[in-house]
Amino acid sequence: MYKQGEPNLWTGRLDSETDPKKFRHFQTVTFEDLSKLEKSSMPSGVGILGYAVDKGVALNKGRIGAKEGPDAIKQAFAGLPDLNQCETLVDYGNVYHDHEELIDTQKEFAMLAAKSIANHRQTFLLGGGHDIAYAQYLATRKVYPTQSIGVINIDAHFDTRAEQESTSGTSFRQILEEDDNTDYLVLGIAQGGNTQSLFDYAKEKKIDYVFADELLNHVSPPIKDMIERFVHEHDVIMFTICMDVIDSAFAPGVSAPAVLGLYPHTVLELAKRIIPSDKVSSVSIAEMNPTYDADNRTAKLVANLVHHFLK
């Protein structure tokens, strides 16, 4: 079920009503009905769409609450300064789960997300469970039907479980099983968060991955080269971040908190090798769970990631 954006989420400190250099995002955001959006001749500006769904988390036996994530992130983002002075910043609202099957919600979200991807230079998709990634893939493939897609996931988990239905832990297996013209790179894998069968599947499917331990103090030149080569080798990049990759000291409000997770600045350093490329079709950030957040710490962290990713 699709609902348009809520203007009352977008509030913040007012420093000036006339000087754009003192504006914050709540002063520049606009709201549109994405279901009625027509394709523009030239993509421009930024589109934001929320995936207010945690059904996939429940199916994956995780702790629910991530469906409240998109609104919490938007509220935290609203008060940040508009340093980039975006051409346009549009909040398209959220998609909610009201279908019998999760896959139908994912398809509904994909149809709408594809419109944003086609119309904007940047599209941010805010979760919600990491089943958003499969919906993001469907949207990407709709916009780019023949191009090679490189999927980059900053995550503690492979999310390649073999299940009978779509869950927050199956997205990337679904993508790889359905599409031979995609490849998968995972950054931040937790050795204690994935079974041997998932490592075996990664070997079978030639999934590239980097352990969280390898990213402890810095992003080494070989890892930077790996990321840049992966971007270079594909026509389109689908970029996604699962917030459970970040240590729970910084991101307590997630579905599955990390005890040996990455530092936020490491995630930013990794993203610097990805975001600047014009090949990046969209960015999704998943598993922000306000139910378990402390002082809105995780919501603010996601908001600041989006803020840093604006270009």
UniProtKB/Swiss-Prot annotation:
Gene Ontology terms for molecular function: agmatinase activity; formimidoylglutamase activity; manganese ion binding
InterPro entries per the UniProt record, alphabetical: HutG (IPR005923), Ureohydrolase (IPR006035), Ureohydrolase_dom_sf (IPR023696)
EC number: 3.5.3.8
Disulphide bond pairs: none
Co-factor binding comment: Binds 2 manganese ions per subunit.
Stored SUPFAM superfamilies: Arginase/deacetylase
Gene Ontology biological process: L-histidine catabolic process to glutamate and formamide; L-histidine catabolic process to glutamate and formate; putrescine biosynthetic process from arginine, via agmatine
UniProt binding sites for Mn(2+) 1: H130, D155, D159, C242
Metabolic or biological pathway, per its Swiss-Prot or TrEMBL entry: Amino-acid degradation; L-histidine degradation into L-glutamate; L-glutamate from N-formimidoyl-L-glutamate (hydrolase route): step 1/1
Domain of life where this protein originates: Bacteria
Binding of Mn(2+) 2, residues: D155, H157, C242, D244
Cofactor: Mn(2+)
Entry keyword set: Histidine metabolism, Hydrolase, Manganese, Metal-binding
Membrane-spanning segments: none
Catalytic reaction list: N-formimidoyl-L-glutamate + H2O = formamide + L-glutamate
Recorded family membership: Belongs to the arginase family.
Known function: Catalyzes the conversion of N-formimidoyl-L-glutamate to L-glutamate and formamide.
NCBIfam families xref list: hutG
Classification via HAMAP family: Formimidoylglutam
The name this protein goes by in its record: Formimidoylglutamase
Gene transcribed to yield this protein: hutG
